[in-house]
Amino acid sequence: MTTKNIKNQGFTLVELLIVIVIIAILTVVSLVAYNGLQNQAKTSAAKSAADAVAKKAELYNTAESSYPADLAKLTDAAKSGEPYYLDTKTVNAGTFATPPAAPPKEANTIEYKVCADNKGAHVKYYNFSESKVEERTVGTCPAATTSGS
């Protein structure tokens, strides 16, 4: 009678645990990177919306000799033929608390405030990557004097 040497093949429990830990680490790293990319994309969309509002406000100033009192002047459907018209899908009117309590739900949320002397305006948007509100000024708007909404 001959005996066969049977070699146990397979993985030990320790080897399986090591593989599971490595997979978990890779998952966490990829999720963190993905969230960072999402925040960069949202910030880019918010900045684009703010740039669009700033450009349309300048066009409004050229056509009407004053800056719009609020975003509604730029998004008025009755003015859709005007060069300063801004589609409501492009921008969402909103306000930001200082400091911001929470990020806006929509990336294209913009706060627009015309200056008291109507020679410029402040356009604010949320930077999702840095969790802060950023501001862009159009025209010759003094930093501390704003009115309207």
Question: PLM features: what roles do these ranges have?
Answer:
Residues 1-11:
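N-terminal leader/signal peptides at the extreme start of proteins
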Residues 11-21:
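N-terminal signal-anchor/signal peptide hydrophobic helix marking the start
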Residues 12, 29, 44:
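Conserved Walker
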Residues 21-22, 49:
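Residues within membrane-spanning alpha-helices of integral membrane proteins
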Residues 23-41:
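C-terminal juxtamembrane segment of a hydrophobic transmembrane alpha-helix
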Residues 39-67:
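Membrane-proximal N-terminal amphipathic helix
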Residues 62-130, 148:
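Extracellular/periplasmic head regions of type IV pilus-like filament subunits
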Residues 129-149:
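Short, low-complexity, Pro/Ser/Thr/Gly-rich segments in the mature regions of secreted, periplasmic
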